């Protein structure tokens, strides 16, 4: 008699029932585990979102007088089509020689951050501070004077009217916020030339006096991890080869290095960064 014929039919039937019952229980456990894991992931995502939302309250928000902001209404349909799906934010860096005063001062740094809402790609464009533009009422002068004359509303209007834009969002920072941010990130790596190292000396001395820091001068060119004062001094260099073209390039280089460093930082560092710096924005 074959081995198959020796199998007890009743025992085999019970075995199949038990096997199916076990598989159902195992599948149910897997579903419960999957749901549990998904709940944990969703809770973690929610916790991170709530964490950053809670920190946003630290940012000093100024309610713009929209009646004072001019938007170029003569933009062609072709340009409007290209601009659809993008958001442009004006970024101003003030030379106000004082901490925390973001309502006045010349905007010696003017950048436009263009955000692709679909890909989240960000492109930075600088507006040279010595560019002669209509700063309001048909008066043409250096564009960095608009912020000093009428605050963010006039500076934004100047950009909209002269550059065919429709900006309504902006960010303003001063020396102190940049210095604090770089220091909290542990510095930023920069390649410095001999000429740049020499030109940074005067700016480092001035920033030390303004902020109470004791940043050291650079004796020669090379690759350095710049602290906040040194990075700000580097971004402020306005002499040497390249003039304002090179100066704005340095500003974008520092900002890009800060973003990359922040992306590599742990949550504790990011938390400190938000707590310390958001009040200066």
Regions found by a protein language model. Give the residues of each.
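Solvent-exposed, polar/charged alpha-helical surfaces in well-ordered, non-transmembrane soluble domains
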Residues: 141, 145, 153, 157-161, ...
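Extracytoplasmic
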Residues: 84-87, 104-110, 119-127, 138, ...
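Second-shell loop/turn segments in exported
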Residues: 98-101, 141-149, 164-169, 237-246, ...
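Soluble non-cytosolic domains of exported or imported proteins
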Residues: 103-107, 137, 146-153, 172-176, ...
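Flexible, solvent-exposed short loops/turns enriched in glycine
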Residues: 123-150, 204-205
